[in-house]
Amino acid sequence: MTRSAVIATTLLVGLLLLANRLDPVREGLNATYYAGPDWSLSSVAATPREYPSTERLYEAWKGAPPEQFTVSWAGSFLAARDGAYTFSTVSDDGSWVYVDGKLVVENGGRHGPVEARGTTPLVRGVHAILIKYAQGGGGIQFDLSWGRDGRPVPDTAARI
């Protein structure tokens, strides 16, 4: 093997390893839990999550969560095709969904389980997503769903 072939092979392997580490949809979401009502107190846990959910709150707090807390899930998802994507939350209390920095779902305030949805056009490719949830006391619920052109998107396409 010539010296230039060795260099080219080494560079290719290095680029492949780097691409694997930078894959924005490989790791899912990063969940950060805060023991306060406005994401300002220090976080109590930050863990990767495949899907935003309140199911693991007891795990994050190693027991019952406080009466008031906030959670943010941040990461990326893959839009497999161009289209109008609809995001929906059902939350007890407030929730917000941002796609590529744009507010798509606003379900804020203190309330029982309420659904809110929003639609945004997306081109095929990877998009940033930030999901926020605020619990102000009482019942705890958060559910996220999304779809393209009126049809649900399979979980495997989301990788969030």
Annotate the PLM regions.
Residues M1-I160:
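Acidic/polar, compositionally biased interaction segments
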